[in-house]
Amino acid sequence: MTDQTSDVHMVRGHRPPKAEFMVYFTIIFIAALPLAFIASFLAMVRQGDLKTKGPIARAWSQARIITPMIFSA
């Protein structure tokens, strides 16, 4: 009996083109900025300190979460 698992070729996952990924990331980041400013302002008002995540960090996080979802669909 032959061992059919010894010569298995691993198929590499399809990686999205870098330029296209960055275009989508930029669009999502810009779209998330206004909502991130509002969320940061409300968090600052409620908590009363500036230790909360800033608006740019919030928008960046959202873009990092959403953009790969688009390419994996």
Swiss-Prot record:
UniProt superkingdom: Bacteria
Example GO BP: photosynthesis
UniProt entry keywords in alphabetical sequence: Bacteriochlorophyll biosynthesis, Chlorophyll biosynthesis, Photosynthesis
Described function: Required for bacteriochlorophyll biosynthesis. Directly involved in the assembly of both the B875 and B800-850 pigment-protein complexes.
Entry similarity comment: Belongs to the PufQ family.
Name recorded for this polypeptide: Protein PufQ
Species this chain originates from: Rhodovulum sulfidophilum
